[in-house]
Amino acid sequence: YLYIIFSILLVIPSIFYLYQKGTTAGFNIYFDFLLNKNIDKKISTTCFIVIFILLSVVYLRIIKEKNSFKNIKELIKYVFIVCSIFLFMLPWTSSDIFYYMGVGELDSQYGQNPYYITIEQYYSENSNKINDEIMEQAKDNFWANTTVVYGPISQIIFKLCTKISNKNINICIITFKFINILIHLLNCYLIYKITGKKIFTLIYGLNPFILIEGIVSVHNDMFVILFTLLSLYMLLKKKNIVLSVVFLGFATGIKYFSILLLPFIIIY
């Protein structure tokens, strides 16, 4: 219960922000845990560090007492509950998700190729035609003047999420977060299938850093982990090197550095 309590404490500032604003549109408070510009950032940072350390201590204690979960299903259910809490935490440590939305929106709603045109460029040339809160948010993003640096599979995911959202930024961020939660749970299961031990699923599934990066900041590394695990599963459990390479190719289609694992698969 302590892990859930400290998780809720981390989410409370976001709940207050959403209660006051009613939307994520216009969100631009980064590296300020309390999400309140009237409170000194040192106080805000101290609050986060204290809660995060306490959460990490409880996390290490749970790992030590791994037998508190009777089976893998019980463990994954617990991970899902924790992820559901972090679903409501705003991405205050990174603005990347709004960049994902922007390049997805360029593709899905405006038929533009974000590998050739930036969010900033398209918006400046067509601002009088745009009535879109996702683009309004994305144009002010730190990466708005950068073309897509991710692989094509990443872009397909961005495009599908924004297509579903129909220009609604709140639906869009929930869609991205919900998908990352599902991927995180699938990763937990794959780790168990590969290792046969709950402890490794526990170490990954409740890792505070992974939850912050994957569920709160909604980074697409969750998909890299998924396809890498599928690649390892096919190689180690199914002895199928062809499918292993295919899934590694999918991981590379998210972030290009994944190709660096190919020599190890071939050598194996």
Task: Give the location of each predicted region.
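Start-transfer (signal-anchor) and selected internal transmembrane alpha helices
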Residues: 1-12, 18-88
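Hydrophobic core segments of transmembrane alpha-helices in multi-pass, intramembrane catalytic enzymes
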Residues: 48-55, 101-102, 184, 220-231, ...
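Transmembrane-helix motifs of polytopic, lipid-linked glycan transferases
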Residues: 53-64, 172-198, 225-226
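Intramembrane catalytic core of multi-pass membrane enzymes that act on lipidic substrates
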Residues: 71-175
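Transmembrane-helix signature of polytopic, membrane-embedded enzymes
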Residues: 72-74, 191-211
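Aromatic- and kink-enriched transmembrane "portal" helix at the membrane-lumen/periplasm boundary
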Residues: 87, 169-173, 177, 184, ...
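Specific aromatic-rich, kink-prone transmembrane helix
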Residues: 189-190, 223-240
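Membrane-interface alpha helices of multi-pass inner-membrane proteins
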Residues: 211-214, 231-234, 241-266
